[in-house]
């Protein structure tokens, strides 16, 4: 088949590898091999731990964080029934929450606000909490505790 992907075109990778094996040099600006290996290792780790177990943990963490924020009066951008388990995007009026600087001051990195790109007003502000990472899902309670300790100081 012919690939329509630049980054995962296996025929291109094969030609690159064959060039090296034949003593030549080739350049293809794609993900480094060590990143591919790290991704493979993560996939294997995920499979070993259990896809269903991690899926349930991801939903548990996302639901807990969303419920916690709602209890603090923080409204989610996602309507009920349209939430994602690994990302929580919420409204704020505080520019230092929106840009993540209040979190950074407490040693936590978040993503800055997410524009909706649907004619929102100029003062529109959100912040995004990424709940990704196997380390976070292996112990939902500990992850939730670390997050809420910072949220209690920031909000």
Give residue spans per PLM region.
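Active-site C-terminal subdomain of aminotransferase-like
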Residues: 1-67, 71, 135
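Short, hydrophobic alpha-helical segments
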Residues: 47, 151-155
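Conserved C-terminal alpha-helix-loop-beta "cap" of PLP-dependent enzymes
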Residues: 70, 74-142
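Short amphipathic C-terminal alpha-helix that caps PH/PH-like domains
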Residues: 143-151
């Amino acid at each position: 088949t012919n690939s329509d992907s630049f980054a995962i075109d296996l025929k291109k990778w094969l030609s690159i590898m064959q060039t090296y094996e034949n003593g030549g040099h080739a350049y293809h600006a794609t993900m480094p091999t060590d990143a591919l290996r790290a991704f493979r290792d993560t996939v294997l780790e995920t499979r070993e731990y259990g896809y269903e177990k991690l899926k349930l943990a991801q939903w548990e963490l996302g639901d807990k964080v969303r419920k916690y924020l709602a209890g603090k009066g923080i409204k989610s951008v996602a309507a009920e029934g349209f939430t994602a388990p690994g990302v929580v995007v919420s409204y704020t009026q505080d520019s230092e929450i929106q840009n993540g600087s209040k979190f950074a001051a407490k040693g936590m990195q978040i993503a800055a606000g997410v524009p909706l790109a649907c004619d929102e007003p100029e003062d529109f502000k959100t912040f995004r909490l990424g709940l990704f990472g196997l380390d976070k899902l292996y112990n939902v309670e500990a992850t939730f505790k670390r997050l809420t300790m910072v949220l209690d100081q920031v909000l």
